[in-house]
Amino acid sequence: MSAALRVGGLVPLTTLDYPGLLACVLFCQGCAWRCRYCHNPQLIPARGEAQIRWEDVLAFLQRRQGLLQGVVFSGGEATLQTALPGAMARVREMGLRAGLHSAGIQPRAFARALPHTDWVGFDVKALAEDSDAITGVPRSGQANWRSLELLLESGVAYECRSTVHWQLFDLERLRRLAMRLRGVGVENFVVQLARSGRQLDPQLIATPAPQGAAALWGELEALFPRFELRDA
């Protein structure tokens, strides 16, 4: 099954995408959501124009043995591919840790990947009731939050992160999201400020943080055992 993994891009070395490890990133092709701030819209179709064969990925990893410590399966939405669990297992057989970037679009598929995963960067889009305005897909928030429950129950190491574009969030909405996350047991939360430039929705333009944002960052630092503010 792993031979069928559709990879639309590869970053050969990163210190940012898997905390504490030297890793490469595989951008898995395909996503069922249409997040307005998505900065990799070329990965949304199930099949892209620039595909990297799984055999070539494995050959690359073999050459990097002794340097790389982990592989991050990103997207797109990697869990939509049935080949993902087998691909992650193969990476672990090579002595590498398997990281996953996911929004848990389909909770059952997300659950199938978790046993093969060493760390998850989990994307919480918004409160469940607010998520459709970001993803463009009805009931996406319910799926997102159900997968978060599965992640917290699994014991797999994680960070939860929310991408914030100030045309889609205000301070109070972000505060409520953070309170809800802390209430369900999230201990590690990252706010990612959305990039300007290439994104799926051209109507989203660079928007400065509202007055009071600095005070909110202080609140979130006090709320979570681990909190970080970063650029997406």
Regions found by a protein language model. Name each.
Residues L58-G70, T79-I205:
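Conserved AdoMet/S-adenosylmethionine-binding subsite of the radical SAM
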Residues M1-L16, G20, W166-A232:
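Auxiliary Fe-S-binding modules of radical SAM enzymes
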